[in-house]
Amino acid sequence: MSENDLFGAADAPESMTRPLAVRMRPRTLDEVIGQTQVLGQGSPLRRLANPASKGSLTAPSSVILFGPPGVGKTTLATIVAGQSGRVFEELSAVTSGVKDVRDVLTRAHERLVSRGQETVLFIDEVHRFSKSQQDALLPAVENRDVTFIGATTENPSFSIIKPLLSRSVVVKLESLEPDQLIELVQRALTDDRGLRGEVKATDEAIADIVRMAGGDARKSLTILEAAAGAVTGDEARKKGARRPIITPEILARRWLTSCS
């Protein structure tokens, strides 16, 4: 998938049927909530996201994003590709083998040689790759045929082979703070890509969502979306109902608490 396909899809009408967490993905590093400790000026991710980094020998050729679920690892990889103008290729370590890796690397090399177009190769759950699968990445990383970004919830010191780790910048991501999750939920309630102001939530309900999410941005939006669906269904059955409001009582429903 190219970055044009990826980010163009966010503006398509049918994208409103996608999960809220997908619709609300930041499109630039400046839209990202949290992770300020690794997104400052001059940081590896900022440098990679700069279009001027293409062809640069000083920008990192390999980055390992290490952190718990829901902190933005996939989002950051797609932003780096989109902002810098690189093609985005994605593999899952769960379903991809050595042949899949080599096929992507071959395409990336041909793209670079024939059109001068660089590629971001993103591999989710890279800690699940075997030694031979990780070994297959080394030549392309060394030759800068791709900018490799791997995501892992496991300590890279124990899950990534030493030759690849020594060529990588490790970026540690943290769970979001409560105030950051509050900002995220409030943005999703009003943003045109989110709930468009069609549903409200009390401060107490937002606090409950944040508590249930436990620092996980994706989980907070999943809970919010489920609650919005529940309260919208309730209000639709009432004649003359005003804008639906998410309350702690809605969030306490047994089926909805399973989202957390």
Language-model-detected regions and their locations in the chain:
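Conserved AAA+ ATPase "SRH/arginine-finger" region at the nucleotide-binding site
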Residues: 92, 169-182
